[in-house]
Amino acid sequence: MAAARLLPVPAGPQPLSFQAKLTFEDVAVLLSQDEWDRLCPAQRGLYRNVMMETYGNVVSLGLPGSKPDIISQLERGEDPWVLDRKGAKKSQGLWSDYSDNLKYDHTTACTQQDSLSCPWECETKGESQNTDLSPKPLISEQTVILGKTPLGRIDQENNETKQSFCLSPNSVDHREVQVLSQSMPLTPHQAVPSGERPYMCVECGKCFGRSSHLLQHQRIHTGEKPYVCSVCGKAFSQSSVLSKHRRIHTGEKPYECNECGKAFRVSSDLAQHHKIHTGEKPHECLECRKAFTQLSHLIQHQRIHTGERPYVCPLCGKAFNHSTVLRSHQRVHTGEKPHRCNECGKTFSVKRTLLQHQRIHTGEKPYTCSECGKAFSDRSVLIQHHNVHTGEKPYECSECGKTFSHRSTLMNHERIHTEEKPYACYECGKAFVQHSHLIQHQRVHTGEKPYVCGECGHAFSARRSLIQHERIHTGEKPFQCTECGKAFSLKATLIVHLRTHTGEKPYECNSCGKAFSQYSVLIQHQRIHTGEKPYECGECGRAFNQHGHLIQHQKVHRKL
């Protein structure tokens, strides 16, 4: 587009300075509705920026006058075109109101200018003709500067100009008003003085050093998103954000790490990634001294100490300490599972869960414990594992005082006191304290066994069962009794064994008062009172109250 046309600056041999007489109307660039309709969204955005910048600069000179209607329209987010006037006063679009009464001798104007060609590429119509002031394309991406020009004269009685001038960058006095477009960088003498923020948002009172920054900010309040992606239709409030978004479609990743070669779409992501190599963690929690690579991670962490949960689900009222967790939660209500595994077709509501799941297929365990060398497929599991070495249990139950190494474990424990079971099975109605227990239970109905032993091919519905099974092959017995030194492959088995030394029998029968050291033994015992025999022989139909008794009975049929 050609450069934006601004009114020539009227000045004469008056004793008052030009600045004292300059008003916003003298330099405003007004549009008719037809001209406004012809602009694309990007041009409209640039027009808004230039007009607001112009007004801000005029105001900064301390000149009197009320706020023009067009500025009020822009602040309200309305279309800033002016109504066409009737007859000879019909708007010329790009010119302010008083310009309709002026006639410009373009030949004189251009010959007075330092032998430079007119920046608007007007054509000479002859010495006796007035210049054709028909609108040219409105705004360019180059800098537009309004400053002092050679003195012109206006005959106020006849409303005829004796001279007129095209504005030239060479004639600028830098003490005058300067209007700059968004796309050009400010030179030091053009920038707003350091620390000064003259542009204030009328909605929230926030101040900015440039009007273009104010305009971008105001789109938060108006919801305006003029920059639209031509591929997917997604809209953005800033052109720079659209440029970054386009890289999703093009696959462009121009920012490459010098250490490992990993590439990123956005420079800020590369800067954060560099901290992995340098080990830099500049953001430290004042409560517990834990440090983070990103400020956002610190802010999220601090909510553990404050208990703040600012993100509330509008459907169920549940609150979260991070916006991404809220978005993931909302998919519980919508049933949306946008992340699909290419190997088995299983879908997930959270991308992180998909990545964890894919490691089942690849066997990848990228998170290694620095203490014992044990590797894990999930970082959160490694963090929990670290507490085995440190013994740290920072989360305490307010009911019973029991402490836990992880906050989620505390939350699950608290449901023992409240008896809350928020996760119900749609098939049978059985409810569970933990969501993971529901998922595992649902495999009873589906028959799914996604966890397969690499040694013998045996499959399991729960990952924990696979881990326990693998110890049969490895012979690992990580749980040792401190009393007698006996080792066990399962922690639960160690707990039961310890009761041999303590004599503890916490499970008591309500019918006869007999106590047991194991919950499973209590369940078997209670069948004596109820007469329940859930284990039935497929050969003869005989039923038993214990699974072990059924196994023994079936050997009778095999001998026959």
UniProtKB/Swiss-Prot annotation:
Main location per UniProt? nucleus
Matching InterPro entries: C2H2-ZF_domain, KRAB, KRAB_dom_sf, Znf_C2H2_sf, Znf_C2H2_type
Name the SUPFAM superfamilies for this protein: beta-beta-alpha zinc fingers, KRAB domain (Kruppel-associated box)
Where in or outside the cell is it found?
Nucleus
Mention any one GO cellular component term assigned to this protein in its UniProt record. Answer: nucleus
Query: What PROSITE patterns does this protein map onto?
Result: KRAB, ZINC_FINGER_C2H2_1, ZINC_FINGER_C2H2_2
Q: Where is the signal peptide?
A: none
Residues of the KRAB domain? 22-93
Q: Which Pfam families match?
A: KRAB, zf-C2H2
Q: Which CDD domains match?
A: KRAB_A-box (cd07765)
Q: Please, which domain of life does this record's source organism belong to?
A: Eukaryota
UniProtKB keywords: DNA-binding, Isopeptide bond, Metal-binding, Nucleus, Repeat, Transcription, Transcription regulation, Ubl conjugation, Zinc, Zinc-finger
Zinc finger (C2H2-type) positions are: 199-221, 227-249, 255-277, 283-305, 311-333, 339-361, 367-389, 395-417, 423-445, 451-473, 479-501, 507-529, 535-557
Cross-link Glycyl lysine isopeptide (Lys-Gly) (interchain with G-Cter in SUMO2), where in sequence: K125, K136, K148, K162, K225, K421
Extract one GO molecular function annotation from the record. Answer: sequence-specific double-stranded DNA binding
Q: Which BP terms from GO are recorded?
A: regulation of transcription by RNA polymerase II
Look up keyword Zinc-finger and say if it applies: yes
Query: What is the recorded function of this protein according to its Swiss-Prot or TrEMBL entry?
Result: May be involved in transcriptional regulation.
Homology family: Belongs to the krueppel C2H2-type zinc-finger protein family.
Q: What is this protein called?
A: Zinc finger protein 250
Name its species: Homo sapiens (Human)
The gene behind this protein is ZNF250
